[in-house]
Amino acid sequence: MRRAFTQNFVQGKEIGAAVAAWVDGELVVNLWAGTADEDGTKPWQVDTLSTVLSGTKGLTSTCVHQLVERGDLDLNAPVARYWPEFAQAGKADITLGMVMCHRSGVIGPRQRMDWTHVTDWDLVCERLAAAEPWWEPGTAQGYHMTTFGFILGEVFRRVTGNTVGQYLRTEIAEPLGAEIHIGLARTEQHRCADRVAKPHIRQMLADVDAPGYPTSLAEHPKAGLAVSMGFAPDDEVGSNDLDLWRELEFPGTNGQVSALGLATFYNALAQEKLLSRKHMDLIRVSQGGLETDLVLGRRVADHGWGLGYMLNQRCVNGPNPSIFGHGGLGGSFGFVDLENRIGYAYVMNHFDATKANADPRSVVMSNEIYAVLGVK
């Protein structure tokens, strides 16, 4: 593992990064190197926090599934049972499960929302409640890049009275001693790594000759991607006010974690401390998405989807197709392997927007764990 981790730096693929892994309840890997800033003046530390973007969805999904196991939520129930206003515009039958496996059709609002709108949680939820789905719910797959966190977060708030970030902190992170955050106090943000080569939305949509917010997914091949980014500022993933973006809660996209913290979280799943094995066997059943996704196209072909998590159906991240976790745009990834009792996480600050759960930097290390264990 140390050799594979070092090679990423030698080959010029990293600026700062960390990787951690637990096996059978024992911390066996905890490596970090490089710098947390592009200028090379801020050494990466064991508690350096990195933005994991959609890796946040693995944290949020686990919070939601804890409520399901307690009987407070039902995955087969309509979202509108918990959030009545959501039933508008043909959404009365959309279930929580549809949202968690990206099949609800609510990938974004029907109008563009700039950064000033996004910081108003109630306004975002009002727009989503009024929005018509972009396809008939349940009939197709399309990645809920930002709406995943808002829809589940609003349901969570209405049922518990707390936000996902508050619950994560008090019920999971603090008991585990894990550095995992959704919404980070400004007093803690000095520990955050700068994002380098961060993905710009304009670059991702640069080949689209169709200005303006789409009115239909048929307008151009990347219409779904444009809609799913409908909450993001015009220039980059994140915001023009990074301190505010880190401080607010976006339960689908702005988690701040250390590699050790995220691996500790997934180790707790491996140890069945957060969810029962019976429930985890349910949520890692494939819900489709291996071939076509109306937002990501064929980019999901490496994994497939469970209920809130990425799977490993093509065995890219090791030989076990039944692991589950979540990657984030840029390269971070974390997962749990129940059969081999592994909790793994890799984070970095040099973003590669071309990979999600299959970034070569992480893939080589996740496979190395299995090689060391002799698992084929």
Predicted regions and their residues:
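Active-site-proximal alpha-helical segments within enzyme catalytic domains
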Residues: 102, 148-155, 249, 253-275, ...
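Short, conserved catalytic-motif segment at the N-terminal edge
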Residues: 1-52, 74
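Flexible glycine/proline-enriched surface loops and loop-helix/loop-strand junctions
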Residues: 45-47, 131-138, 148-150, 241-251
